[in-house]
Structure formats: structure tokens, C-alpha cells
């Protein structure tokens, strides 16, 4: 089989670590993958080294979060093989800081409704560079409030049309500035 050019690891909101992702690709006979974590380049060099060791070509990339002002919606730009990854680092850091603040605020909102602590959610986010909605849902699953991360409780807490929504959207840059 060819490849998968949009893979996330535990460094962002993926379920697998870098090596486990590469081993899964090898097992599935996927020859090429691109590691494109959200606003994070941290796994690209390690991924390349591990990929070479296991015969899987790893393309370094990143999924950059931004906003399309014309549509008034979030957008995600996939960037591969950047000539200047150091120039992307500042943007990734700013986006991560915004995402971290939003995640911390969502944890506090969730803790008002459920007996969970920020420390427990952070434990469920272990290995990630940020706090994502699924980390909060994972903590609630571990506490027995749901049997799945992306089920009804997830929709109730994070869907914008839910009266119980605790979702807080991070502030991201204008897509035109990113391009």
C-alpha cells in the first residue's frame, strides 16, 4: 500500500507514540507516512530516524491551525518538507500557547460538572504537547462517565450547539498571514 500523509502522534491528539505509529505502518505495509501533528514539529526528526530503522519513509510535516476570515472558520494547513522549519517553530509555539490556555479553561469548566482534577486530565494527556478535548474526554472515561472517548458525552461537552458545551476555541492566526 502507498502511504498516509496525515498522521498524528501522542505529541498532539493521536493515540500512538511515534515508534508505535511507525510499527503500525510497517505492519500494515504502508511504505510512507507523514507525521503532521497539530502545531508541533517535535516528532519529525525522531520519526525519520525510527522510520529509517523500520523501513518506513517518514515525511516531516506539521498541521498548522489558523482561521479563514472569509468563511469565519478554523482551517488547518498541512505543511510538508519545510525548507525553513525554524520559521514555523514560532508560529507553532504561539498556537500551542493559545491551545494550552483554552485547554486549561476547558478543564476548569469540566471540573465544575465532574469530580476530576486538572492533574488527572494532564495525566491522560501524558506525552502530548498540549491539552486537547479528547484528553478531557479520556479522563471522564477513566472515571466511568462514558465508555468511549468520542461518544455522546463528547458531543454533549464539545458540540457548539449543545447547551452543556464547555468548549473553548483557541485563538489562531489569519490563514493569509500563515501562507
Q: Predicted regions span which residues?
A:
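An N-terminally biased module of ancient metal coordination in phosphate/nucleic-acid-related enzymes
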Residues: 1-72, 156-177
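Domain-core and long-helix interface of multi-subunit machines
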Residues: 4-17, 101-179
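Membrane-targeting and insertion segments and their boundary/processing signals
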Residues: 18-21, 77-80, 84, 107-110
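Glycine-rich loops and low-complexity Gly/Arg-rich segments
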Residues: 27-30, 58-60, 83-86, 102-105
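Short C-terminal domain-edge/linker segments immediately following a structured domain
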Residues: 33-38, 64-66, 89-93, 107-112
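Generic hydrophobic/packing signal
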Residues: 62, 81-83, 114
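Active-site gating loops and adjacent loop-to-helix segments of metal-dependent hydrolytic enzymes
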Residues: 67-94, 98-100, 138-162
Amino acid at each position: 500500500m502507498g502511504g498516509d500523509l496525515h498522521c498524528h502522534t501522542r505529541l498532539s491528539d493521536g493515540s500512538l507514540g511515534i515508534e508505535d505509529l511507525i510499527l503500525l505502518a510497517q505492519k500494515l505495509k504502508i511504505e510512507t507516512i507523514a507525521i503532521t501533528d497539530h502545531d508541533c514539529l517535535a516528532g519529525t526528526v525522531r520519526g525519520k530516524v525510527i522510520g529509517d530503522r523500520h523501513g518506513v519513509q517518514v515525511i516531516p510535516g506539521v498541521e498548522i491551525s489558523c482561521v479563514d476570515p472569509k468563511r469565519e472558520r478554523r482551517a488547518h494547513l498541512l505543511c510538508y518538507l519545510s525548507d525553513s522549519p525554524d520559521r514555523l517553530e514560532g508560529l507553532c509555539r504561539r498556537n500551542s500557547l493559545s491551545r494550552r490556555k483554552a485547554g486549561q479553561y476547558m478543564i476548569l469548566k469540566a471540573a465544575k460538572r465532574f469530580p476530576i482534577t486538572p492533574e488527572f486530565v494532564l495525566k491522560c494527556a501524558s506525552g502530548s504537547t498540549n491539552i486537547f478535548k479528547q484528553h478531557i474526554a479520556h479522563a471522564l472515561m477513566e472515571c466511568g462517565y462514558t465508555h468511549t472517548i468520542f461518544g455522546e458525552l463528547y458531543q454533549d461537552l464539545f458540540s457548539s450547539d449543545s447547551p452543556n458545551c464547555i468548549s473553548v476555541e483557541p485563538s489562531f492566526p489569519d490563514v493569509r498571514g500563515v501562507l
